Amino acid sequence: MAKVKIGINGFGRIGRLVARVALVRDDVELVAVNDPFITVDYMAYMFKYDTVHGQYKHHELKVKDEKTLLFGDKPVAVFGLRNPEEIPWAETGAEYVVESTGVFTEKEKAAAHLKGGAKKVIISAPSKDAPMFVVGVNEKTYTPDIDVVSNASCTTNCLAPLAKVIHDRFGIVEGLMTTVHSITATQKTVDGPSSKDWRGGRAASFNIIPSSTGAAKAVGKVLPDLNGKLTGMAFRVPTVDVSVVDLTVTLAKEASYDEIKAAIKEESEGKLKGILGYTEEDVVSSDFVGDSRSSIFDAKAGIALSKKFVKIVAWYDNEWGYSSRVVDLIRHMAAAK
């Protein structure tokens, strides 16, 4: 199958990391980037140097001119347009556009990219109305007539594969999720105004901040069997990357914690290899920086109260793992018949 040509709108955390993932893979080709708020030389700087993931070393990166970045010998077109419908994706051959501004998360707004020649749009965030797909869980329900999709959230990508295994094997009656989540760009370095979420405006590096998340409820969209059975919340904590899901569930069938571990291990080595991981090591969050899997079950961190009530813990690099799934979803869509 030919390389799938990708464009990226919005060169923030996820946009830049999707670009990093795409540039080291041989099944996709990055051809264009659009961001109205940064110049091409600043784009190159932000791409090359990354506090969390380190300096980019796979290609020599140069600015050819105001509209072109060179990754080694590979040119990537650069645009600086605010309106999605004005971006000339067709000129660059970009068929799949990653919408990672965080602004155009609704189906109709994201669909504006189609006017510029994009064939499909992948929103790198949850969406109110675009169909959501989580690779390893429900991507097989995608059909080629769908032009705008959402890759859900990083937390839903961690939780859904885990919930699927538990539900398929033992049945989930109901459950609560907490994600202990690293800082993201929407937070404040010092206390500042945040009228919609007062707590969210407090200093990110000095506080544990309770926050809402739709990640658990969204699992019900990708796994309809679990609709209405899961909900959850988040604590934002002062780490810059890697988060951890704590899923506490009531099971339909009795199971020992060892049986649950065995089921997850089996799936992590089988159908969900590369998506779901399994570890019995004494790991901490920084051990997962740069881990491309969606969800890594921590066998030593979980605990069971009884054969029907259990807490399951899974790590995820909320930046790199998620960005890897964006590219996987594009490949799946391109291959779908």
Curated annotation (Swiss-Prot):
What do we know about how this protein assembles, alone or with others?
A: Homotetramer.
Residues binding D-glyceraldehyde 3-phosphate = S153, C154, T155, T184, T213, G214, R236
UniProt keywords (A-Z) are: Cytoplasm, Glycolysis, NAD, Oxidoreductase
Active-site annotation = C154 (nucleophile)
PANTHER family the record matches: GLYCERALDEHYDE 3-PHOSPHATE DEHYDROGENASE, GLYCERALDEHYDE-3-PHOSPHATE DEHYDROGENASE
Q: Which InterPro entries match?
A: GlycerAld/Erythrose_P_DH (IPR020831), GlycerAld_3-P_DH_AS (IPR020830), GlycerAld_3-P_DH_cat (IPR020829), GlycerAld_3-P_DH_NAD(P)-bd (IPR020828), Glyceraldehyde-3-P_DH_1 (IPR006424), NAD(P)-bd_dom_sf (IPR036291)
Annotated EC: 1.2.1.12
Q: Name one Pfam family in it.
A: Gp_dh_C
The protein in question is named Glyceraldehyde-3-phosphate dehydrogenase, cytosolic
Matches recorded under Gene3D superfamilies: Dihydrodipicolinate Reductase, domain 2, NAD(P)-binding Rossmann-like Domain
Task: Supply any other comment.
Answer: Plants contain two types of GAPDH: cytosolic forms which participate in glycolysis and chloroplast forms which participate in photosynthesis. All the forms are encoded by distinct genes.
